[in-house]
């Protein structure tokens, strides 16, 4: 499947991806071009054993991998996200990433930015995934 051209010459993706990207519990929703909750798949990372597994027919929890450095942590999270996206998308997709929350303070804001920066860089390197950032106030 490829992206269809609109009358204005822009392309419409067949797979829409919503990403709420955090350090502790990032989540991804994979949807077709016509949203139907029952046809979506929802994926999240967790450190809590009770939240690992399948819930209903379309919600999946995955365990965080262990890490030794912050960069290893960020790489693990972005690898998980890209694996989920590539497994569940069609040929081309459009991802929407929730932007940064300005409520974050101190060292956390830098880790959040570095984490998301790695994901955005890796998405940019994937020719079949376009992405946009959506500010939290409109989500």
Describe the function of each predicted region.
Residues 2-139:
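Phosphate- and other anionic-substrate recognition elements at nucleic-acid/protein interfaces
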């Amino acid at each position: 499947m490829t992206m269809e051209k609109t009358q204005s010459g822009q392309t419409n993706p067949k797979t829409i991806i919503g990403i709420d990207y955090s350090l502790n519990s990032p989540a991804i929703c994979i949807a077709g071009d016509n949203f139907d909750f029952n046809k979506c798949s929802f994926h999240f990372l967790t450190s809590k054993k009770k939240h690992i597994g399948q819930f209903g027919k379309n919600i999946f929890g995955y365990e965080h991998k262990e890490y030794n450095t912050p960069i290893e942590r960020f790489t693990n999270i972005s690898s998980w996200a890209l694996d989920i996206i590539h497994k569940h998308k069609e040929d081309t997709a459009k991802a929407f990433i929730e932007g940064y929350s300005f409520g974050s303070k101190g060292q956390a804001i830098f880790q959040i930015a570095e984490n998301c920066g790695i994901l955005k860089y890796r998405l940019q390197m994937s020719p079949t995934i376009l992405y946009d950032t959506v500010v939290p106030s409109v989500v």
